[in-house]
Amino acid sequence: MAAALICGATVFTACSSNEDNNTSQGGTAQIIGRWTADVTGATETLWGDGKALRMTELSSDGTGSTDIYYLLNEDIAVGRSHQTFRYTASADGQLTMTIDGNKATETATWSMTDGRLTLQTNGQSLTLQKTDAVTEKRIIEWNAEGDLISVPAPARYTVFVYGNAGGTMDEIIEYGLWERLKPLLTDESNVRVICFYKYGKDLPQKPFTGKFTDPGDILWFELNSQTDFSKLKTAGLQSLGFKQEAQDMKLCDPATLRMFMRYSSLFCPAKNYVFTIWGHGNGFSAITDVPGKYYTSETSTTRGVIGDEWNEDEQLDMYELSYAIRSLSQRPFDNIYFHNCLMGNLETLTELRNVTEYITCSAHTLCSNGEILTEYIRGLMEKGNTPEAVDLMFKRTDDVWKPLYLEESILENSAPYNGDMKLLRTDRIDPILEATKRLAERLVAQYPTQQEAIDRATTSVYRFFTHPFIYFQQAMFDLADYAHKVANETGDAEFAAIATDIDAAFSNAFVRYEDVNWNTEQFLPHYTLSVCLFDHETYHIDIMNRFKGLNPLCNINDGYEQTTFHQMTGWGKWLDTNQKNPRGNPTSGGGKLLTR
């Protein structure tokens, strides 16, 4: 089933040569032979929860090969990488290998202890033992199967594009990302892109617009210069006879996400991984934020990354995303790129700070036709690192991306929308949390004597998005703006010091950012990240009984106090203390309508 799901993928071929006309002199007799080691979790794939077995053969004529077998259940091989080389070895423990194909040279030291061969290079060591008869038999059987995934040499980057945006928006990923990127992806050793996309429902009011396949179908393919879009449909799950399975497959299930990343990494392994979400983001929602949706032993979920309209808009949560990455890789991803709305909230980002080095996100609703993600990936190809790629992304899209917010305002007959997009380093989030903890503690301590001033700040802080009907949904407010509003209204020196520290922490964490300000009445000169803000009554409202139509899993306070963000900052204690409902605040899309 997994092999069938790699629909539309380019046929992968081994990235090494099998030239056998080697004349290099081999090493000492001690190291000649076939050697085996368990390298589970130490490869450049995301096969961390499966076994990986390495077999290296060193021949007496100075030639050698290394195969890595990727296994299920210890004895079922799924994929194999193959590399051949020439080598020289000296009696004093020096080993030099020249890789066939790319001619790269690797050096190591070798030693023998109790019949085991240890190789050391770049501060890392690997101990191999002579391949026994049982393993030899298994390897022969695995190679005879003939349908193993051929795992190529790792690229510099593999970018995962995972999503579902709905039938009215499917065309955006088609022309806004796939068609734009296709001619650029020519070098498999540099950046590879692999997509998993579920097409939306055919809405009667807005006919289905997808041109590559049918509603509910799932496409799983590598995007490169050779991708034939006309053949995607024939490789989709529905065309393969799995129509109901495609519609029932939940994007929100971490098992689906893990399967996608796990098998994709065999076809497109990389030294660095980027995970991009393409879809609708709901930010953080405390009423659907409870532990144990799929894994009952785990805690701290933050829901709202991406929904699946074929499954009652069920949401993937941030813990499940974190779990999927941690279960597959011992090293963090390079970047998580949220190409969706409202994901620049601290409740969410706190959960992800240990599974990725960078996060790209917007605290506002995001306006994009795919140009920003396209240019980010193009920047990776040219610069080879995320910060410079994001810098190029902004430079190349500034005159196209920012006007989209104004166009959206006109289409919706709204006051002008604001926006933002930022890249932050996750290892610099903790100072933000530490300053937020001080702010929460100071708010609780000073509220009895300075309630009126703090209430003024609460009702004037900038809100990133205001739900048209339900005031406590997406109640996300700019943290730095709140700290400064409180300091200004109270005149308190400690609040002022905290606001200064929050500014410094954000400045240190943000590697690159752009703000979009079309609204000249309700805006901030610079946007940071959001936090939830409720009054005591709302924080404890009986949502389970009073708002059943929202399908809540818990009340706000129950969900909020299970987040890592609350556990590190105590922010929920302030929400429990605050008596002022922040309604009517300055917001994106607030104020006077555009002049036509």
Which functions belong to the PLM regions below?
Residues 8-38, 122, 127-153, 595:
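Bacterial Sec-dependent N-terminal signal peptides
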Residues 262, 266, 290-596:
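Terminal, contiguous helix-loop blocks that mediate binding/assembly
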Residues 144-271:
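N-terminal extension/subdomain marker
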Residues 1-6:
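Sec-dependent N-terminal signal peptides
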Residues 168-173, 202-206, 283-287, 343-348, ...:
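Extracytoplasmic/secreted cell-surface and envelope-processing proteins
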Residues 41-47, 63-125:
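Contiguous, well-ordered beta-strand patches that form the walls/edges
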Residues 158-162, 192-197, 273-277, 334-338, ...:
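Structural recognition of the beta-strand scaffold that forms the well-ordered cores
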